[in-house]
Amino acid sequence: MLKTSTYEDLTIYKMGRSIGKFVPYFVHCFLLEDTLIDTGTGFAGSEFLSALQGKKVNRIVNTHYHEDHTGNNYMLQQKHAARIFAHRDSIPNIENPRNVKLKLYQKWIWGYPEGSATEAIGDHLYIGSHPFRVIPCDGHSAGHICLYEPHKKWLFTGDMFCGIRNIYLRRDEDFNQILLSLEDLSKLKIDTIFCSLKGVVTGGGNALSEKIKYMKNLKKEILSLHRQGMPADKVRNKLLGKEDMMFYVTGGHFSKQYLINNVLASPYSKSTVE
């Protein structure tokens, strides 16, 4: 399934794999001038290609290598001769996606992308008249970048934002590194966030501040309860509840307990959150 909308100069593509009428997970891609930011899932590839008819796609920027962000790279590179850019640490897995062993749910929802030739992105780029800073952000994946347009105060966050209140952590994520990256991003003047999961988030600076506040408070509560002698599984039950469908559907890849354990194991957690 694919839906198209616009926001100022942007065309936004919301897509996901259709299982009958059910779409288990949507992602967003953003076209500005001739540049596409992320390419979504290959399961929506034919619809995406049709939606892009009559548009120029000379360049693709991948925020990171995950399969729901690179799924149509190869097809668009073949169709439009688009050059693809990403952080150097993402390039090996974009060019050779089977370097990464996908979980069963990932294969079902997104599938393996085809490999695509990719170039290292610099610190800055222009998309038409729009200047962008390229900002590396740790915590979600190796080689993740965000894109910031200072005149419009736009921030393209890939998977660094994904809503204010998150109660799960992927087993390849780092809670404290995500928090540090978000704190760095919060120093920017932000009007609008463009999020792979949530789409357009107006009042983006406030939303980012709320997310940081939530994460810091959650971390503080986790550490406080643990220092009082509460076992980690009891901390989870009190603050986040027991594991639910997300845990079982993803085979434990998304986990409340892993969030708790990750906070407790981090060297950053040896000091009190201000």
Q: Locations of the language-model features?
A:
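Divalent-metal (often Zn2+) His-rich catalytic cores of metallo-beta-lactamase-fold enzymes
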Residues: 79, 85, 177-232
